Amino acid sequence: MSKDKDIKVTPGTCELIEQILALLSRYLSSYIHVLNKFISHLRRVATLRFERTTLIKFVKKLRFYNDCVLSYNASEFINEGKNELDPEADSFDKVILPIASMFVKCVETFDLLNYYLTQSLQKEILSKTLNEDLTLTAESILAIDDTYNHFVKFSQWMIESLRIGSNLLDLEVVQFAIKCADEDGTNIGETDNIFLQEILPVNSEEEFQTLSAAWHSILDGKLSALDEEFDVVATKWHDKFGKLKN
């Protein structure tokens, strides 16, 4: 692991990390909110009871992740960096590594959840209910995929730009894209595959903050679009199915 000692743990970097974690918490919360509504509707569909149980398990996992994110306090590392004899005390790696690990954990879970939610579950709903009242919209599925792709890329950027990469931080979807590109002889410099786009290392706190701010803006926009589509879907579920409870 290569470390850039020019980047230290400062109040500025801690504030930046808190903003990054806030985005991850928002991502998790968006799913928790919409899935809870979905689970509530599924309670009245006996043929989908096992699917409902699976979603409950996912929600519990996402809620646990969110609790971990919300309880993380990056500023604690500033106080730990007072001992000048400890060369690692002020290292930015010390605070960013657990965050990178959490991002990897979350996006890998979203990978499984998104596959289940947008593909296999949609087929089960159609085959067991014979209608589309509880299905996702095409637009919501696109938003789910787009948001996921950008969070994966941000996770990849956070790891590779700081040169803290490890096989324990590898993302399956990225490694699969690289493998396919190698087998196909794809020119990475010309591909539009977001996972294959080059990531350059950062060499200062200012550079990391500038690029993180740009990423924050991108992810904020993706989450806003995702929330809009989730709202549309939740309204559809209520209008076509939820009113049956009255």
From Swiss-Prot:
Sorted UniProt keywords: Cytoplasm, mRNA transport, Nucleus, RNA-binding, Transport
Domain of life (superkingdom): Eukaryota
Pfam families: She2p
SUPFAM superfamilies, per database record: RNA-binding protein She2p
Recorded GO MF terms: RNA binding
Annotated compartments: Cytoplasm; Nucleus
Similarity comment: family membership: Belongs to the SHE2 family.
Protein name as it appears in the record: SWI5-dependent HO expression protein 2
Name of encoding gene: SHE2
